[in-house]
């Protein structure tokens, strides 16, 4: 690879809550065109600020205030000021996420000597925990509404969304109700975007008309490569997304060079230990042993999800049209009343609030199944 890379932009992606510990997920764009997801805590940012002051005393204004170029990281009192009267750790966490994003952007906008220093490059480089294929049990990921940019609005309305929802297709026709008690009819081969997966087997999906509904997971399967909602070919999403557990330097022309934490698309797998991958605008071979399913990146981008016993991303065939006459998939047992909401965070429950349920069942729907959150 030509020269060391350095971060060029940082964007706040999500608030990750693990029991009582809050960490902040960021999407980091690098000088080589790649992007990675990292998680950092508030204390880690405070330690970064301290290290920068020791490493760059002039830029920190320790000798003369007029020479200061390092941005300030507001303290706890300044952070809580815009949130007076508001209740909840989630609101404060989202405010911190916005504040840390602003601080990170200002750091990268300082002098090149500081912005490209090993201190900042190392801080935003993926760490072993960032490369884990799954978040710790009990983790909650809270996404801020995209349009809520100002800090003063960070504790406002929230929404469940995906940065890039995964598109799955329906195996057979199925009728249920959406989150507003309207008929939700899915046809065979229809593409649905998965917004939220729940262990009960009922997933929150969205159709082309922007209707959202709880839908049985056995009725869904991965769409064929290049057959998204728009129906056009897309090399950028032609395979599952994996993460490089460590850096790799190519030794042949048909191989790829990737840094640690690089997110690659697997175009073709092989039992010989080398997979054909796409990284940026280049395609080449990578050792399969270096690749692992994404954890946080998959959750935030909605891609790379592999279910069942297929964690290694092995190629799977797609059913022929004649298989549409096969017996309908088994519908999972609906959870007990309130089971899904009890497993969701407060943000999710608020996003799923709806009008009072109407009486009667929708017309033209055979064996209509209410979504699990509407049972009384």
Swiss-Prot record:
Changing residue 332 to A: Loss of intramolecular interaction. PROSITE patterns: PX (PS50195), SH3 (PS50002). Changing residue 274 to R: Induces interaction with NOXA1 in vitro. GO terms for biological process: extracellular matrix disassembly; regulation of hydrogen peroxide metabolic process; regulation of respiratory burst; superoxide anion generation. Changing residue 40 to Q: Loss of ability to activate NOX1 associated with loss of lipid-binding and plasma membrane localization. Residues 326-335 have a biased composition (Pro residues). The keyword Repeat applies. Residues 1-131 form the PX domain. Residues 302-376 are annotated as: Disordered. The keyword RNA-binding does not apply. Pfam families: SH3_1. Residues 328-337 are annotated as: Proline-rich region. Residues 163-225, 237-296 form the SH3 domain. One of its GO terms (cellular component) is NADPH oxidase complex. Expressed in testis, small and large intestines, liver, kidney and pancreas. Isoform 3 is mainly expressed in colon. Isoform 1 is preferentially expressed in testis. It comes from the Eukaryota. Keywords: Cell membrane, Lipid-binding, Membrane, Repeat, SH3 domain. GO terms for molecular function: enzyme binding; phosphatidylinositol binding; phospholipid binding; superoxide-generating NADPH oxidase activator activity. The PX domain mediates lipid-binding, localization to the plasma membrane and is required for NOX1 activation. The SH3 domains mediate interaction with CYBA/p22phox. Also mediates intramolecular interaction with the proline-rich region. Interacts with NOX1, NOXA1, CYBA/p22phox and NCF2/p67phox. Interacts with SH3PXD2A and SH3PXD2B. Constitutively potentiates the superoxide-generating activity of NOX1 and NOX3 and is required for the biogenesis of otoconia/otolith, which are crystalline structures of the inner ear involved in the perception of gravity. Isoform 3 is more potent than isoform 1 in activating NOX3. Together with NOXA1, may also substitute to NCF1/p47phox and NCF2/p67phox in supporting the phagocyte NOX2/gp91phox superoxide-generating activity. This is NADPH oxidase organizer 1. It comes from Homo sapiens (Human). The lineage of its organism: Eukaryota, Metazoa, Chordata, Craniata, Vertebrata. The gene is NOXO1.
């Amino acid at each position: 690879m030509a020269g060391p890379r350095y971060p060029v932009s940082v964007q706040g992606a999500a608030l990750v809550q693990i029991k009582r510990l809050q960490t902040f997920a960021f999407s980091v764009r690098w000088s080589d065109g790649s992007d990675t997801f990292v998680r950092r805590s508030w204390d880690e940012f405070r330690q970064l600020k301290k290290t920068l002051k020791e490493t760059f005393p002039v830029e920190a204004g320790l000798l003369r205030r007029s020479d200061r170029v390092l941005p300030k990281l507001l303290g706890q009192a300044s952070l809580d000021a815009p949130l007076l009267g508001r209740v909840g750790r989630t609101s404060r966490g989202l405010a911190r996420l916005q504040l840390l994003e602003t601080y990170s952007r200002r750091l990268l906008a300082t002098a090149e000597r500081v912005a490209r220093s090993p201190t900042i490059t190392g801080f935003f480089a993926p760490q072993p925990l960032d490369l884990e294929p799954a978040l710790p049990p009990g983790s909650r990921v809270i996404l801020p509404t995209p349009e809520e940019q100002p800090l003063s609005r960070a504790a406002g309305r929230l929404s469940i969304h995906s940065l890039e929802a995964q598109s799955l297709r329906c195996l057979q026709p199925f009728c249920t109700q959406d989150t507003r008690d309207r008929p939700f009819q899915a046809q065979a081969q229809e593409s649905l975007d998965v917004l939220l997966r729940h262990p009960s087997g009922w997933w929150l999906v969205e159709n082309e008309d922007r209707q959202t509904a709880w839908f049985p997971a056995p009725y869904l399967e991965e769409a064929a490569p290049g057959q998204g909602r728009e129906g056009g070919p897309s090399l950028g999403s032609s395979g599952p997304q994996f993460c490089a557990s460590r850096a790799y330097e190519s030794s042949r022309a048909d191989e790829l060079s990737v840094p640690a934490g690089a997110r690659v698309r697997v175009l073709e797998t092989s039992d010989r230990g080398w997979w054909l991958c796409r990284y940026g605008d280049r395609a080449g071979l990578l050792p399969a042993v270096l690749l692992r399913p994404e954890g946080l990146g998959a959750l935030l981008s909605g891609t790379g999800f592999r279910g069942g016993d297929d964690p290694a991303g092995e190629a799977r065939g797609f059913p022929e049209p004649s298989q549409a006459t096969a017996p309908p998939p088994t519908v999972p047992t609906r959870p007990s009343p309130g089971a899904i909401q009890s497993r969701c965070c407060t943000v999710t429950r608020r996003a799923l609030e709806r009008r009072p349920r109407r009486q009667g069942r929708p017309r033209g729907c055979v064996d209509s199944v209410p979504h699990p959150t509407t049972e009384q």
